[in-house]
Amino acid sequence: MLRLQLGKRIVRNAFSVVVIRGFCSSGPCRKDWMANNDILLNATAAMKRNKEKVQRGSLDSAHTNGSFRQVNMNQRSNHNKKPLKKPRSIVIKWSTGSDRAKEAANSTVSSIFKMNFEGTVQRINSETNKVEETNIREFVKGINLDEVGLSIVDVSQINENTSIPLVKLVEARVALKRYSDEMAKQKEKELIEMGVIKKSTKSSEPDKVESTVKRLKISWEIKPDDLCKQKAHEIVTQLKKGFKVFVYIDSKNSSGSRNWLDCFENSIPQEIKLSKREHEQRSFVVDKISEIVEEYSIQPNLDGTLGDKMIIKLAPKTLTGEKMDKKTLKEHKKKERQEKLQKRIEKKNQRGTGL
């Protein structure tokens, strides 16, 4: 009979099975064969489990090393990245003005730095009457918030992310009112978005009154031909329609801005010294406008000076006359109807008496 004998030897981290074959001269050995077969099966299963454990350990090690490598790469990339530039927090210490005036001024300064982080602004030089660039820090030096405030009257777009505002000094009360109106509009917008109040569509009474006034702007540097043709036509046309006309005359730099009316009404008067030629030019503009509207307007009302700016307020001549003519005609027709009715009554009475 052939008898299978197994020798087993354990090596570190693995099993090695040595199979030894030999001849056995004894009788049947079924029980020994079954026992040896179980040993073989158990050894094979143990080897399989150990192999899986080794493979799993290598995968975990690779995953861990990969994670550490990814973390190190992320740290390295974050280290190489430049930190984002934080917006500058500008703090201006005002030595004058009320708390409300300081809030209004800081609100304007904050708006300027949102337009460009360097704080670059434009201003009109009172001596040369030309637009110059400066910094808001320099512009606000020495101003008294008890008397004046800041106002953005126009904005020049430089590129997608940068714009330069045109800044002027206005009266303190004007700056405070504008700031209060802005805060009120912002609060109203928030309440509308929350659904607390509804947006009003009705026009106010002052808006209706303002609709009867037409506003035109003219620069002191206007050419005589443009004044006598284009502007003269605009003024006369509105007067013929029965509108009041306000003519705003200022320097070319100011009148060309987007918010020219706001700039005109709220800027602080700045008298400049005129040359002889400039004085003659400005006198010509005022005299020519008065000459153009002489036939269509009552006596013009002039407000301002040649050295700074001026408003010429015009009212149509025929407006009052037309109203009086219509009223007189209405009364005349009413009187005629009464007279005709009276005659009919008298005739009727006469016929009745005759019968």
From Swiss-Prot:
Give me the stretches of Basic residues compositional bias.
Answer: 78-88
Transit peptide: which residues? 1-30
Composition bias (Polar residues) maps to 61-77
Q: Which domain of life is it from?
A: Eukaryota
Q: Which InterPro entries match?
A: AIM23
Compositional bias per record (Basic and acidic residues), positions renumbered to this chain: 336-349
CC terms in the record's Gene Ontology section: mitochondrion
- Protein location: Mitochondrion
Sorted UniProt keywords = Mitochondrion, Transit peptide
Which region ranges are annotated with the description Disordered? 55-88, 322-355
Similarity remark: Belongs to the AIM23 family.
Q: What is this protein called?
A: Altered inheritance of mitochondria protein 23, mitochondrial
Specify the taxonomic lineage.
Eukaryota, Fungi, Dikarya, Ascomycota, Saccharomycotina
